[in-house]
């Protein structure tokens, strides 16, 4: 399978630069993956697509203000972008570093609020291992010195509104450097409407990491190596998934990140145990899904691994037909864009 098989034309004006006026006011495209039938509505009415006995699994990761501005000891400007936590305390991180010259191990970058970043060593994917000091309370200081890591296709600086809207209402566990964007559409009242239909809503955690920003660099997808992302599935969620699969009920994943965690952790029969690990699963067409029966997701970038995952779930031709229709109907794309419900 070739990278070019996942390209499509997207007019730049359809890339959402701002969130919808209200979370649940985003448009919703529905796609029946068996018939290919396409429908249209709004996210506010998504509860209508749930039935009693369904399980909705959400990702409760919380985006950290991962973009840090500072200066090198020589006075030159430097930008540090947190990618992945490398220790339990949250002091050591894998980072992208942008400055005039490549940093040297042992050198310092001076940030605000008395925080310093010491370059430890070079790591994978053009990143560096960086140790931050003071050692205690670094994650708390991030709220003061960092800014929201908006994706590069949003052509404006992060603002106060992004601090709220580039975060799900159920975000709990700090560690993501990008939002699980399908969840951005949901409000507490909408979740309550879904529960009222006899649906359980349970969390897992997957910290969205470096791969969100990394393009696929190979033409032949069999040569691609997926990035790793930390995840944790609690006992209550694992048991609920297992019970639904045994009973023939639906497991609905809110987002591709939730899907990756579930599919990485699941046994062949779809059952789950509580688990903590790193997901590096690369899902492309031909993959047999073990747990997920329906998927809520946004519209994804051409040639991205997320688009490949959704193509595997919906069928490539059906999905690309839906994307062409979304372009024709002027849906909004990517992180702050509209949503799909694929069943």
UniProtKB/Swiss-Prot annotation:
Q: In which pathway does it act?
A: tRNA modification; tRNA-queuosine biosynthesis
Q: Which UniProt keywords apply?
A: Cytoplasm, Queuosine biosynthesis, S-adenosyl-L-methionine, Transferase
Q: What is its EC number?
A: 2.4.99.17
Family matches, as Pfam families = Queuosine_synth
Hey, which family's this protein in? Belongs to the QueA family.
Q: What does this protein do?
A: Transfers and isomerizes the ribose moiety from AdoMet to the 7-aminomethyl group of 7-deazaguanine (preQ1-tRNA) to give epoxyqueuosine (oQ-tRNA).
Q: What do we know about how this protein assembles, alone or with others?
A: Monomer.
Gene encoding it? queA
GO CC term (a single one): cytoplasm
Annotated compartments: Cytoplasm
A GO BP annotation: queuosine biosynthetic process
Molecular function terms from GO: S-adenosylmethionine:tRNA ribosyltransferase-isomerase activity
Q: Which reaction does it catalyse?
A: 7-aminomethyl-7-carbaguanosine(34) in tRNA + S-adenosyl-L-methionine = epoxyqueuosine(34) in tRNA + adenine + L-methionine + 2 H(+)
Keyword Transferase belongs to the record: yes
The top EC class is transferase
Q: Mind telling me what this protein is named?
A: S-adenosylmethionine:tRNA ribosyltransferase-isomerase
Matches recorded under HAMAP family: QueA (MF_00113)
